[in-house]
């Protein structure tokens, strides 16, 4: 395999082989008449090319940090700072955050909920959830200047948590943003 920035060597070793021909020419005691010894390199590569979609159903135990268990096909953020780790090459993108359900703004006594979005600890912008877009897909453009080259990028959602018991009396969780998927579209 030739070098490509789409692959990363995650394991490298050498396999040692030794063989004999076990040719005994019909004699009572088999004796090797030939012996061969050689080594072969072993490389295990991980595919790391641009991954443009991070669905909760596929990533909640790996790339999603600060999110709760999968609920159907989405996860609630359960920490004020919840992150999705992404493999992207620097470029200008439109980030699309698909919500898994609505946030009960009315029961919480709020007209809107603001989610600050950070890319690699730099503020990329804010998503404002209100009655018009609650439960839908929210978009935010990001510049290539915010993305790391040849490294994993962190998209962090920072929002105020609310008590789930406001809606479901026996639910003691603190919840934030219901993320179904994060997608990147090249601009």
Describe each PLM feature range.
Residues 1-187:
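C-terminal luminal/periplasmic domains and tails of membrane-associated envelope-modifying transferases
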């Amino acid at each position: 395999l030739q070098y490509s920035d789409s692959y990363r060597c995650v394991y490298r070793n050498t396999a040692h082989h030794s063989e004999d021909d076990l040719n005994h020419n019909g004699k009572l005691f088999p004796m090797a008449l030939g012996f061969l010894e050689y080594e072969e390199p072993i490389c295990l590569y991980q595919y790391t090319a641009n991954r443009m979609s991070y669905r909760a159903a596929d990533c909640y135990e790996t790339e999603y940090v600060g999110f709760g268990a999968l609920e159907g096909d989405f996860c609630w953020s359960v920490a004020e700072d919840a992150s999705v780790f992404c493999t992207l090459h620097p470029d200008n993108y439109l980030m699309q955050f698909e919500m898994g359900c609505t946030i009960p703004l009315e029961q919480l006594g709020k007209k809107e909920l603001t989610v600050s979005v950070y890319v690699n600890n730099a503020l990329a912008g804010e998503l404002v959830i209100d009655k018009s877009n609650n439960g839908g897909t929210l978009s935010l453009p990001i510049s290539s200047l915010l993305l790391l080259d040849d490294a994993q990028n962190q998209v962090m959602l920072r929002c105020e948590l609310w008590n789930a018991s406001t809606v479901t009396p026996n639910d003691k969780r603190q919840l934030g943003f219901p993320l179904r998927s994060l997608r990147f579209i090249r601009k």
